[in-house]
């Protein structure tokens, strides 16, 4: 009888693990942390998450040579919404990406979304294997 009582607890034990290893979380981890182009870019610092599955989100950087930050946000939504991932903008700015000389400069603000934490952006870029050897300067 005690064995059956112990087995009745099994769904409560397994449920959190099933939630942690669901396909929604795998798709969140599968989103690249950094996507920026060469040259001068506008960029957004974005917190992504899935409702009901994750307690904390993942912060990503997206940048492109476009007219305004809203265009970048639209492309982020096109990329993430089909996967069921939500995006919250933390701020924006500009990145001067000189890939030939392995230098980057992060500066400025977004008129639409406000200023991003440029130091946090630098840390994310340096953790990415493509940009770990770059000299990244931040100007607030």
Curated annotation (Swiss-Prot):
GO terms for cellular component: cytosol. Substrate binds at residues 42, 110-112. InterPro entries: Janus, Janus_sf. GO terms for biological process: cell differentiation; sex differentiation. The active site is at 69 (proton acceptor). GO terms for molecular function: protein histidine phosphatase activity. Keywords: Differentiation, Sexual differentiation. JanA and janB regulate somatic sex differentiation. This is Sex-regulated protein janus-B. It comes from Drosophila erecta.
């Amino acid at each position: 009888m005690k064995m059956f009582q112990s087995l009745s607890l099994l769904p409560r034990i397994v449920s959190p693990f099933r939630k942690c290893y669901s396909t929604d979380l795998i798709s969140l981890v599968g989103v690249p942390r950094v996507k920026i182009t060469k040259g001068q870019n506008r960029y957004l610092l974005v917190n992504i998450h899935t409702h009901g599955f994750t307690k904390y989100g993942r912060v990503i950087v997206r940048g492109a040579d476009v007219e305004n930050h809203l265009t970048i946000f639209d492309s982020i939504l096109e990329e993430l919404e089909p996967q069921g991932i939500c995006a919250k903008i933390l701020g924006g700015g500009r990145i001067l990406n000189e890939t030939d000389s392995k230098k980057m400069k992060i500066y400025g603000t977004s008129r639409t979304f406000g200023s991003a934490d440029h130091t946090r952006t630098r840390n994310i870029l340096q953790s990415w294997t493509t940009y770990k050897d770059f000299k990244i300067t931040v100007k607030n």
